A protein has these predicted regions:
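Fe(II)/2-oxoglutarate oxygenase catalytic core
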Residues: 1-228
Length: 228
């Protein structure tokens, strides 16, 4: 059994923290089997362009337990600050032509630098990894409450100047530039701040395969403080 391999880096001019863990789970195939038994699969709300269903609570518990010290070292967040986790099986299914403008640009999950997001790959490098971006006109690489309104206004100005974006972003554009890319790899976890601008690398020839064993199948997790 392979031991997990953890790498930490800081990306972009704002030096946002990024963690990558390879061989994260001892038996990842069990998650695929679990997913196939789930009956409630729905079109995702929000900006995710595909299908989602609940991942087992044990996945989130394992993540919090295994990475508690690493999260404190890399993100400066104590275990007491991250006691709640939501995890969802995720499968890209929305054709490029059906995307909204906000799905065609990098997004941030929440404007909260003290909350984290993770993507865990149950697919290989053929399905595209995750890229992190800088917004060219503002220089923002992460969106916080202090800059959110300014960022949204700048986006509207960009749309007027360059046109409304269409399709999946997968590399540099007039509005955004790539500051880091993490390729997909089976059993790889990527952990970053919820405020970081990012997007999956969905290429124009993506087949929208709805089979968890052969499509772009991942688990998305969101870590935050316990609810009051």
């Amino acid at each position: 059994m392979r031991q997990p391999v953890l790498r930490f880096s800081r990306i972009g001019t704002q030096q946002q923290p990024l963690m990558v863990v390879d061989d994260f789970i001892p038996q990842p195939e069990q998650l695929l089997q679990y997913a196939l038994q789930q009956g409630e699969v729905k079109q995702a709300g929000g900006l995710y362009p595909g299908l989602r269903s609940a991942a087992p609570a044990a996945f989130g518990t394992f993540l919090l337990q295994q990475l508690a010290q690493a999260v404190q070292d890399c993100f400066g967040l104590a275990p007491t600050q991250l006691q709640q986790i939501e995890s969802y099986f995720s499968l890209v299914s929305t054709p490029a032509a059906a995307l909204s403008p906000m799905q065609s640009i990098p997004h941030f999950d929440r404007p909260c630098p003290d909350e984290l997001a993770a993507i865990y790959y149950l697919c290989d490098e053929r399905h595209g990894g995750t890229s992190f971006y800088r917004h060219r006109s503002t220089g923002y690489e992460a969106i916080t409450p202090e800059c959110q309104v300014h960022y949204q206004r700048a986006l509207q100005a960009d749309f007027q100047m360059h046109g409304v974006p269409k399709g999946y972003i997968c590399g540099n554009t007039p509005l955004f530039e790539v500051i880091a890319t993490v390729p997909a790899r089976f059993n790889r976890l990527v952990l970053y701040r919820c405020s970081s601008l990012h997007s999956g690398d969905i290429k124009p020839d993506y087949s929208y395969d709805l089979n968890p064993f052969s499509g772009r199948f991942t688990i998305a997790s969101f870590l935050s403080a316990a609810s009051a």
